[in-house]
């Protein structure tokens, strides 16, 4: 219906970028997002963000744009309709884009992560409800798990393997790949972005 409506009066909003993110196609997502963004800024002629092909733009377009960004950064979908949600960090993120984020996942998990030069640095998970946490391993090696700043266990897992562990309410879990520590990233900042991360001695990794 969206496609047909767009052909008739151009009053439609494509969800292609959201679908691409759900499918894990990061580089395609980057191209689609850039293309959609450029329709508002062609030659600088549309500073008020009016669509460059008409004098209006359907409001849902802005929502699908932000939804695609979030799905590219973090997903917590269940593999089946009656399954449990599984967290995936940077499941569909363009390889050339460095990024940091903090987003809420299902079952009350506040997830933070960072990627730079195509390398995911860590995964921090704040458990707000104390539920069982399920995460796909973003690395091609084993993972070290820290609980509230203390090294707790090593998880033998390969890339994209399912990792499952219990959490307590308000517990902070940090996952790093084998051979690294959370302290390496306590004050890390992306070299391609002009901002700073403030350190806090009461937590492994703090964002502002």
Residue spans for each PLM region:
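Alpha-helical support elements that line or immediately flank enzyme active sites
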Residues: 13-26, 72
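Non-catalytic C-terminal accessory modules of carbohydrate-active enzymes
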Residues: 25-208
């Amino acid at each position: 219906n969206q496609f047909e409506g767009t052909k008739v009066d151009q009053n439609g909003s494509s969800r292609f970028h959201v679908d691409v993110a759900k499918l894990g196609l990061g580089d395609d997502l980057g191209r689609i997002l850039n293309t959609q963004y450029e329709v508002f800024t062609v030659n600088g002629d549309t500073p008020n963000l009016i669509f460059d092909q008409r004098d209006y733009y359907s409001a849902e377009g802005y929502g699908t744009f932000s939804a695609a960004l979030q799905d590219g950064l973090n997903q917590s979908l269940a593999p089946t309709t009656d399954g449990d949600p599984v967290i995936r960090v940077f499941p569909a993120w363009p390889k050339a884009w460095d990024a940091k984020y903090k987003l809420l996942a299902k079952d009350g998990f506040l997830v933070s992560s960072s990627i730079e030069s195509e390398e995911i640095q860590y995964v921090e998970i704040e458990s707000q409800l104390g539920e069982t946490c399920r995460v796909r391993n973003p690395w091609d090696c084993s993972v070290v798990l820290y609980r509230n700043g203390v090294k707790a266990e090593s998880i033998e897992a390969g890339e994209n393997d399912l990792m499952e562990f219990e959490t307590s309410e308000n517990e902070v879990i940090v996952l790093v790949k084998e051979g690294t520590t959370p302290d390496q990233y306590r004050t890390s900042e992306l070299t391609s972005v002009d901002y700073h991360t403030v350190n806090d001695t009461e937590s492994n990794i703090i964002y502002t």
